């Protein structure tokens, strides 16, 4: 490749992010690195000199969308050879050099563990190299201020990677083993956010309640010295931060000690995202999830014992290989019994490199689509029922932005993570905690008025 010149005009960048909250946090860090290098954000990718796609490989449709976008920009690059084209994230990690066979116009292919190395990798590109960085490494601590999408709420990574081996999931292959940040580093980042005026922090991890298992130290009782529970106590009193959330939790590591801490610590919001994936024990075993539906129900019951009004959200997969109608109905029964405030649902999508993708008992797309539709109908029904409890109540809402569909309204979220709209001036209310009386409820959102 011919060396690229960092000329005066090659200064605009655009990042498109696919997938989970972890990817969004990675994109914010990479944007911060680019701006530290002198790049300027461009809302329009077609006006950018550097385009980065931060990718997701959990579902096949997300992966195909990436290649569609890449195809369009590859054509642009033939017209403008100075365009820098980057694929980051999980597709990059999984495909590695194979991506270059499909899109030889790429300058840089980098896995999620390399996000904080972006400047070094780009320097290699500007020296005329086509770079692939997917080798496993110890994640470099955050060294650049992220370009955060919000001035009110912020993501803070606390643990990277995943040690689970669910039979359907590519995450351990693409994000590597668990690597916990030190409590001191997390506390320092949150203290900075508090000084910068941020009001809410969401602590992030693929399995966040596994935090600290890889850090040294054991207590006299034999448990790990550093756990998510201990971390919540460590960061709770950061000045300026009014709310703390965490996601995503794994049922295997969700303890009563953690639940009790969430009830005790006033800044921790009463909202818990705990995927169950299936309501059938045989399917859970085939998925290698490491728990039963009875164990999952016990966790939710215990949360509601401590915090009766807690909001519960989760993830579920339908149409897993070999799933019978009866097994699917066990998932419906769990959803009916628990009553989730929100449920992210998906039809099973075979992913390369996972055991389940090789099984010969795959279900038809028609069966998976039918089951997904039936589950979604029940989810909306139960969420609407759960919403009724808010009617007439006064809720604390953190105002985040203007309602894009109604400029006379602002919007924000309750402690239970319900999106809430009400009349108000965004210039006066943004970033404030406002008491709102709920006057209208829908399945997944609320409307109210300032008290």
Curated annotation (Swiss-Prot):
Q: Name one GO biological process term.
A: tRNA methylthiolation
The similarity annotation says: Belongs to the methylthiotransferase family. MiaB subfamily.
Key word Transit peptide present: no
Give the GO molecular function terms.
Answer: 4 iron, 4 sulfur cluster binding; metal ion binding; methylthiotransferase activity
What does this chain do?
A: Catalyzes the methylthiolation of N6-(dimethylallyl)adenosine (i(6)A), leading to the formation of 2-methylthio-N6-(dimethylallyl)adenosine (ms(2)i(6)A) at position 37 in tRNAs that read codons beginning with uridine.
Instruction: Report domain TRAM positions.
Output: 388-451
Q: Which cofactor does it need?
A: [4Fe-4S] cluster
Under catalytic activity, the entry for this protein gives:
N(6)-dimethylallyladenosine(37) in tRNA + (sulfur carrier)-SH + AH2 + 2 S-adenosyl-L-methionine = 2-methylsulfanyl-N(6)-dimethylallyladenosine(37) in tRNA + (sulfur carrier)-H + 5'-deoxyadenosine + L-methionine + A + S-adenosyl-L-homocysteine + 2 H(+)
**Positions in coiled-coil regions:** none
Entry annotated with the keyword Cytoplasm: yes
Q: What is this protein called?
A: tRNA-2-methylthio-N(6)-dimethylallyladenosine synthase
Q: Which gene encodes it?
A: miaB
Quote a single Gene Ontology cellular component term: cytoplasm
Predominant place of localization: cytoplasm
> What keywords were assigned to this record?
4Fe-4S, Cytoplasm, Iron, Iron-sulfur, Metal-binding, S-adenosyl-L-methionine, Transferase, tRNA processing
Q: Which Pfam families match?
A: Radical_SAM (PF04055), TRAM (PF01938), UPF0004 (PF00919)
* Entry's EC annotation: 2.8.4.3
Q: Which InterPro entries match?
A: Elp3/MiaA/NifB-like_rSAM, Methylthiotransferase, Methylthiotransferase_CS, Methylthiotransferase_N, Methylthiotransferase_N_sf, MiaB_methiolase, rSAM, rSAM_horseshoe
Q: Which residues bind [4Fe-4S] cluster 1?
A: 20, 56, 90
Which residues does the UniProt record annotate as the domain Radical SAM core? 148-385
Q: Which residues bind [4Fe-4S] cluster 2?
A: 162, 166, 169
What is the protein's quaternary organization? Monomer.
Ranges for domain MTTase N-terminal come to 11-127
- Cofactor: how and how many bound: Binds 2 [4Fe-4S] clusters. One cluster is coordinated with 3 cysteines and an exchangeable S-adenosyl-L-methionine.
**CDD domains linked to this entry:** Radical_SAM
The entry's localization annotation reads:
Cytoplasm
Query: Per its UniProt entry, which superkingdom is the organism in?
Result: Bacteria
């Amino acid at each position: 490749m011919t060396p690229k010149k960092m000329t005066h005009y090659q200064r605009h960048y655009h990042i498109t992010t696919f997938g989970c909250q972890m990817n969004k946090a990675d994109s914010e860090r990479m944007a911060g690195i680019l701006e530290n290098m002198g790049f300027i954000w461009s809302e329009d990718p077609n006006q950018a000199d550097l385009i980065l796609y931060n990718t997701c490989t959990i579902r096949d449709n997300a992966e195909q969308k990436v290649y569609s976008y890449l195809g369009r920009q590859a054509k642009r690059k033939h017209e403008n050879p100075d365009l820098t084209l980057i694929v980051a994230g999980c597709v990059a990690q999984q495909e590695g050099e194979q991506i270059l066979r499909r899109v030889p116009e790429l300058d840089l292919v980098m896995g999620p563990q390399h996000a904080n190395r972006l400047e070094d990798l780009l320097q290699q590109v500007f020296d005329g190299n086509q770079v692939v960085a997917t080798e496993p490494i110890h994640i470099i601590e955050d060294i650049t201020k992220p370009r955060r999408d919000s001035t009110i709420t912020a993501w803070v990574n606390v643990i990277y990677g995943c040690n689970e081996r669910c039979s359907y999931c590519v995450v351990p292959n693409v994000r590597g083993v668990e690597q916990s940040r030190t409590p001191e580093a997390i506390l320092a980042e949150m203290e900075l956010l508090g000084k910068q005026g941020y009001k809410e922090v969401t602590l992030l991890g693929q399995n966040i309640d596994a935090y600290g298992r890889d850090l040294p130290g054991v207590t006299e009782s034999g448990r790990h010295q550093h756990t998510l529970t201990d971390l919540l106590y460590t960061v709770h009193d950061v000045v300026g931060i009014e709310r703390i959330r965490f996601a995503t939790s794994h049922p295997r590591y969700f303890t009563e000690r953690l639940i009790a801490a969430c009830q005790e610590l006033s800044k921790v919001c009463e909202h818990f995202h705990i995927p169950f994936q299936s309501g059938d024990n045989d399917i859970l075993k085939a998925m290698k999830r490491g728990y039963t539906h009875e164990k999952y129900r016990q966790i939710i019951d215990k949360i509601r014992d401590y915090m009766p009004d807690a909001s519960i959200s989760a993830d579920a997969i339908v149409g897993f290989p070999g799933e019978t109608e009866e097994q699917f109905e066990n998932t419906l029964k769990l959803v009916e019994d628990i009553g989730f405030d929100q449920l992210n649902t998906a039809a099973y999508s075979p992913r390369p490199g996972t055991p389940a993708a090789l099984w010969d008992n795959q279900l038809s797309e028609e069966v998976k689509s039918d089951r997904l539709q039936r589950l979604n109908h029940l989810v909306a029904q139960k969420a609407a029922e759960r919403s009724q409890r808010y009617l007439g109540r006064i809720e604390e809402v953190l105002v985040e932005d203007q309602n894009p569909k109604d400029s006379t309204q602002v919007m924000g979220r309750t402690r239970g993570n319900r999106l809430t709209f009400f009349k108000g001036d965004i210039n006066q209310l943004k970033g404030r905690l406002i008491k709102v009386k709920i006057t209208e409820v829908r399945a997944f959102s609320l409307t109210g008025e300032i008290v």
